[in-house]
């Protein structure tokens, strides 16, 4: 249903071309818990100031306890904090809210909260 990449290889190959890389982890999210898949998890990588920031999207309903259509956005970029390319939380949140629905379905948000507690 998808392709699992070596996250370090992706960053080493294209990281110098961009400020951030988005990993669509719709069908994974569990790789950091399986030792043989650790290289596939962008969230486990040790990054330095020359690496790009990382965004990871996960479809919660595909592998965790969320309702259909629930997803999470993870951001890993402390290693570039202070650099001009760093995306502060406020900017990311404003962009998210710009594209979020004006008619949110609150049970979806509740499902994400429940999932986070599991």
Regions found by a protein language model. Name each.
Residues 1-118:
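Conserved PLP-enzyme active-site core in the AAT-like
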